[in-house]
């Protein structure tokens, strides 16, 4: 293959000029199966039978450009690139010498006017389709990040992606950005940990204490303290849930209404106080070790902790205020209001169960899926609302005109029946009596099954993908933690060996002097 020698070549670059012949329709060269081992290689490694330029005359070479990408050759007219002057292929028209050409492509064959690009041929097929037809699609079998690199290389903006592919492409990019952000935070924490292993200063001791506190509170797999702390947290959550259930027994409720407190009621209060004390201590430790206090207070799990912990202290304040302001002349109205507030606040204690999301990969996956599938949940709610608004009035009219059913007293009451029926729950409290009403009920059941199946499929795939991502991330964290511990042990062993050598030589010198 003959290549241009450089800027001093007498080669006629007029062959690179673009002739504006609108009646010219070049032959389209379809893609062929790439030979095994040619992927990401230069074209000159292909056999002679793959030379497409042999069938192109010299006049056609002035109007056509031959592109060789990863061993697969394409031919397209120069006029195709007029609409895309800012792309990498469009920049070839502005090249005036060999060095300009090599700044755009990887290699150039003068004899056949062929440009070589050492890029992914599969992705270039999509790029070429965009240049020829104006349609840019995301390949399902190709990584979104690799496709982004190809778009940047060929100089094509992401805005040209079709709507069906753009959302999936942006979602993949956002997921990767979140993963990289988490990895950067972990690397920053690891670097802080390595810095804290330095000289034994007051700042170094404080950094080591904060690192150990962070490992114990946020990383259950970091060691024995983290596992013990996580087990205690789960244990107190379980005890709180059981204690809340016991506090609703009829005997305890009667004592509460009468203003009495037996030994069992006192024990329930003590258990609740101990659990809230543990949760308060845990919240305080998490707040102390958080690098960014504002970001910590904004996190969803922190807000859940506050909503679950604060009702206990508010209840104590309200009880104290109610006992101090209690007067015989006011009657029971004030006490009834205070009792209602206390019952509502105590019901919020069930939010302690959400704290298990800190230690459960399944609950974390559920929250991530809910955040990613807001559009699917909106579609599901929209489908149900439309179907409910259709079947409820229809059944109301049928049952009141034909069967005079006592259950379907109004359209809002029929809304409840439609919700229960379309979600296939079927309590049986409202049953259509007439034959047309039963036909409507059957239609609503089938509609509910079909309408719920469409978004649920997408939600299921998102849940599976999110679970796999979180599991892989957890494995990466464990591997990084193990590597950090191995590195720390090797450094400590090296320091101990150096100290042994130093003190050993010093002691030998002392003996020699003696």
Swiss-Prot record:
Q: CDD domains per the record?
A: BTB_POZ_KCNG1_2
Question: Which stretch carries the motif Selectivity filter?
Answer: 424-429
Q: Which cellular component appears as one GO term in the record?
A: membrane
What membrane topology was assigned to this protein in its record? Multi-pass membrane protein
Cytoplasmic compartment segments:
1-224, 290-300, 360-374, 468-514
Q: Name one Pfam family in it.
A: Ion_trans
Q: Which InterPro entries match?
A: BTB/POZ_dom, Ion_trans_dom, K_chnl_volt-dep_Kv, K_chnl_volt-dep_Kv6, SKP1/BTB/POZ_sf, T1-type_BTB, VG_K_chnl, Volt_channel_dom_sf
Residues on the membrane's Extracellular side span 247-267, 322-338, 397-411, 432-438
Q: State the UniProt keywords alphabetically.
A: Cell membrane, Ion channel, Ion transport, Membrane, Potassium, Potassium channel, Potassium transport, Transmembrane, Transmembrane helix, Transport, Voltage-gated channel
One GO molecular function term?
potassium channel regulator activity
TM spans (from-to): 225-246, 268-289, 301-321, 339-359, 375-396, 439-467
Report the locations given in the UniProt record.
Cell membrane
Biased amino acid composition, Acidic residues: 181-196
- GO biological-process terms attached to the record: action potential; potassium ion transmembrane transport; potassium ion transport; protein homooligomerization; regulation of potassium ion transmembrane transport; regulation of potassium ion transport
Any domain commentary? The transmembrane segment S4 functions as a voltage-sensor and is characterized by a series of positively charged amino acids at every third position. Channel opening and closing is effected by a conformation change that affects the position and orientation of the voltage-sensor paddle formed by S3 and S4 within the membrane. A transmembrane electric field that is positive inside would push the positively charged S4 segment outwards, thereby opening the pore, while a field that is negative inside would pull the S4 segment inwards and close the pore.
Assembly and partners are described as: Heterotetramer with KCNB1 or KCNB2.
- PANTHER family referenced in this protein's UniProt entry, alphabetically: POTASSIUM VOLTAGE-GATED CHANNEL SUBFAMILY G MEMBER 1 (PTHR11537:SF88), VOLTAGE-GATED POTASSIUM CHANNEL (PTHR11537)
Record's protein name? Voltage-gated potassium channel regulatory subunit KCNG1
What species is this protein from?
A: Rattus norvegicus
Gene expressing this chain:
Kcng1
